Amino acid sequence: MKPIFREVNLAHHIGRAIHLIDAHCQEVVGQGKKYNPDIDYLCMGSNTGLLHTFDIEDNDKVVGYAVFMIAKDFITSERSASNVAMYVSPEYRGRTAVRFMQYTEMMLLSKGIKQINFHVPPSSMAEKCLAHLGYNLREKVYYKEF
């Protein structure tokens, strides 16, 4: 069966994707480190329209997701979407992941979004994919852990 893409309400859908959230956290944070996604906060954002969530399903199983936070630009007041999480099971990375990114972009544009931002690790496959889809490097993000 061909994977399908959908927009979903994270608050109603979180249970079906928890296995992917675990895999995503292990990939990002690493084995043995503590991770603690704030599920209540994510569900509240989804219920208020501040978060838009999309998924990939194959044979009734969630195999990928993307979560975007919606905000108004400080300077222009145009609506923008910042990707706060995206994970695709390794066996679906490649064409399916690219089509999924195109789908999320199309859906966000249809909601009046004027700008989409992604934060990705340097030299990741996602960075190459975003460049292929026409995204440009605009800023660098610096952070400090305490």
Map each language-model feature to its residues:
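Conserved catalytic-core motifs of GNAT/GCN5-like acyltransferases
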Residues: 119-120, 136-146
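Conserved beta-strand-loop-alpha-helix junction that forms the acyl-donor binding cleft
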Residues: 116-127
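A short helix-loop-beta-strand connector motif used in the catalytic cores of GNAT acetyltransferases and
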Residues: 43-55
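Short amphipathic alpha-helix that is part of the acyltransferase structural core
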Residues: 1-36
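Conserved beta-strand in the GNAT
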Residues: 55, 61-70
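Conserved acetyl-CoA-binding loop-helix of GNAT-fold acetyltransferases
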Residues: 93-106
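A short, internal acetyl-CoA/4′-phosphopantetheine-binding micro-motif in the GNAT/acyltransferase core
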Residues: 84-94
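A conserved beta-turn-beta hairpin within the catalytic core of GNAT-like acetyltransferases
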Residues: 72-83
